Amino acid sequence: VAPGAVAAGAVAVVTDAAGAELLAGLPVPLLVVADVRGVAGRLAAFVYGEPAEHLAMFGVTGTNGKTTTSYLLDGGLRRAGRTTGVIGTVQILIGDQVVPSVRTTPESPDLQAILATAVEKGVQAVSMEVSSHALAYGRAAGIRFEATAFLNLTQDHLDFHADFEDYFEAKAKLFTPQYTKRAIVDVDDEHGRRIVERCRANGVEVHTFSVKGVPADWSAQDIDLAADDSTFTVVAPDGSRHKASAGLPGDFNVANALAAIVMLAVSGIELQTAIAGVGDVHGVPGRMERVQIPGQGFLAVVDYAHTPDAVQTALAALRPLAERGHGRLRVVVGCGGDRDKAKRPMMGAAAVRLADEAVFTDDNPRSENSADILAAVTAGADAELAGAAQNYRVVADRAAAIAYAVAASRPGDVLIVAGKGHEQGQEIAGVKKPFDDRVVLRAALEASAGTGAAAGSGAEAEGEKGRSEQ
């Protein structure tokens, strides 16, 4: 790579000590550093003219909720008249231009190039997901955010981080003066309360929020949850009360909405404008996304929930809707291969604990044997049931699992297909094939109603999202 870069005009190479030995014959200076990734962000920012300094940057981190909160932020910024950009898991938006997203937070040279393009296009504010991988690798170096939000921290990515504390420390890096001017923290999460302590110790301005009655600067009260949206009252630090809404179901989306509102309000956006803009957002790709056909009779949604906590939270949010319709709550879910193995039994346990029926299926097995992954998931389910009647079945083929769940659903029921959300491919044995849960679910609904073809892989979908990071 380095010789090719030099041939293309590079005037110097940044490398580490091992690389310096291999590249000793190059006719350009070698800048030897201990951590190449650690300096790449600052170098890239310099090369591209420090684009983040010309943008109002908003960063969101947490195991769950980053994508939704970023889209809600974007809604508020647009309502305030800003030209906006969004960088995250689903896609990259530069104004109204859509760019495919390979990872949650791009590598630092790519990220700085994207920000430079945003400046050229007249973008004024950017909402950005910041993953623990990005913080560990220094991808966000060269950016100082107007505001950053901490949403939550739960089991995930222990295939990458040494342990849970290492995962926390990676997230905590975002809440230092190097990265942020002000922090907005959910203190319903115990790790959020630790982040507050870090902020105060580091001299970072911090604003807390809660949707569960924990003492905080901002809170959501009078929460009313419906199948498609939620309404609530924002209680500001001065005690004033403001009606608000989130165009997404679930109390966790009230938390996401409140996070976005607070980020905007403490960064100079008028509170009523922030509330209205967040309420403008009625749907985020693959996040509690409703799929329906005429005469369906039951609620069916696709969600990205792919951690034990996310599955539990999603099911807890949908349970009242099933009870309201005197129906059953059913979940289709699996676990990805070549990733955090410790969460597999926990996923199975969460599914059988909160659903009336769980259908365990393939997610992205990648290089692993599907049966081994499903065995770990069902082991967790069996342990949770502790001899009680089995309320799950295994259907390895994902399209068949979705078709079964649709056929089993009756009026008043609620069905959630969890784990892949917006993804448009499935990786099995190193081969990526088109697969979109939304397309497959719709086909299954139409087939069950006798109005369409049998559910397949969703071959209409194109592309394949890369590795997800939290």
Task: Label every PLM stretch briefly.
Residues 1-42, 190, 221, 241, ...:
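N-terminal leader/targeting and accessory segments in enzymes
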Residues 1-61, 68-81, 217, 226, ...:
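Short, basic phosphate-binding NTP loop
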Residues 7, 11-17, 183-187, 332-333, ...:
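Short internal beta-strands
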Residues 15, 19-26, 121, 127, ...:
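Acidic, Mg2+-coordinating active-site environments of NTP-dependent enzymes
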Residues 17-20, 89-90, 132-133, 153, ...:
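Short, ordered loop/turn segments at secondary-structure junctions
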Residues 39-187, 193-202, 454:
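Phosphate-binding loop of NTP-binding sites
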Residues 78, 203, 239, 249, ...:
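ATP-dependent carboxylate-amine ligase
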